[in-house]
Amino acid sequence: MVGTTTLNTGASLELVGYGTWQAAPGEVGQGVKVAIETGYRHLDLAKVYSNQPEVGAAIKEAGVKREDLFITSKLWNNSHRPEQVEPALDDTLKELGLEYLDLYLIHWPVAFPPEGDITQNLFPKANDKEVKLDLEVSLVDTWKAMVKLLDTGKVKAIGVSNFDAKMVDAIIEATGVTPSVNQIERHPLLLQPELIAHHKAKNIHITAYSPLGNNTVGAPLLVQHPEIKRIAEKNGCTPAQVLIAWAIVGGHSVIPKSVTPSRIGENFKQVSLSQEDVDAVSKLGEGSGRRRYNIPCTYSPKWDINVFGEEDEKSCKNAVKIK
């Protein structure tokens, strides 16, 4: 039985969800069907993953009651201007064939200008190497428009993703509305204890993405780390199961992605770690072990904006416009 948590709206959320990032069209639909058959009821989607129509068809085929699913999607960067927010939500609902989302997040604290067909032109280019940024619209502007969605019946809860404490404080101060969730990169190499303590005090739930680390930067995989493998062997489980069990300690949720049926099942199976094992996993991210994998200014094309204050972002010309 998968553990659950209660959001600040009173809604119940399963701690292990099914992620659809980097799941290729043609594979993701089958993955979603297998996930629902396995027992997953928390699905994490986004406009920019470019696979929502297929996910929507798979949800329909799976034949589970809508109210038994918890479905999250995300507002993309080119729809941050207040007048674009509801149309972007409508586009996502249309792609999914749904009447409402359980949770809608601002995907990044970064805005792109709405150019051309904004349902398709997701990365307007400044030039061959860079994405064009919209430095006029603020996070507060976008959050105010998100708050208005709550009255439409099209979303049950709203939240953010990739926001730091300062950004979260600013949107709460401006509107009096606290995000239900902040979805952040979190794994044993990126512990973020200050952000976690801040969110706990404000009753903001944390969902961890990239819980198994990330294989896009050519770094050694976390699932192959000797310490993770040792703990897996000791507990008679897989390294991925160790990382997922570690991630949900403290009541956080996690959204591992796989399109392989056996792995989808493995990721859903609950493993309990001793405190000693939890501490051993956490030690990996202390000191020089720390690593953030998802930094927009390292993307190609580059987003020339400092989001997290990481070393790699110091040369960025632009900062996040908070208010």
Curated annotation (Swiss-Prot):
GO terms for molecular function: alcohol dehydrogenase (NADP+) activity. Catalyzes the asymmetric reduction of aliphatic and aromatic aldehydes and ketones to an R-enantiomer. Reduces ethyl 4-chloro-3-oxobutanoate to ethyl (R)-4-chloro-3-hydroxybutanoate. Monomer. The keyword NADP applies. PANTHER family: ALDO/KETO REDUCTASE. Pfam families: Aldo_ket_red (PF00248). InterPro entries: AKR (IPR020471), AKR3B (IPR044490), Aldo/ket_reductase_CS (IPR018170), NADP_OxRdtase_dom (IPR023210), NADP_OxRdtase_dom_sf (IPR036812). It comes from the Eukaryota. The record marks 74 as: Lowers pKa of active site Tyr. Its EC number is 1.1.1.2. This is Aldehyde reductase 1. It catalyses: a primary alcohol + NADP(+) = an aldehyde + NADPH + H(+). PROSITE patterns: ALDOKETO_REDUCTASE_1 (PS00798), ALDOKETO_REDUCTASE_2 (PS00062). Inhibited by quercetin, dicoumarol and some SH-reagents. Substrate binds at residue 107. Belongs to the aldo/keto reductase family. The active site is at residue 49. Keywords: NADP, Oxidoreductase. It comes from Sporidiobolus salmonicolor (Yeast-like fungus). The keyword NADP applies. NADP(+) binds at residues 210-267.
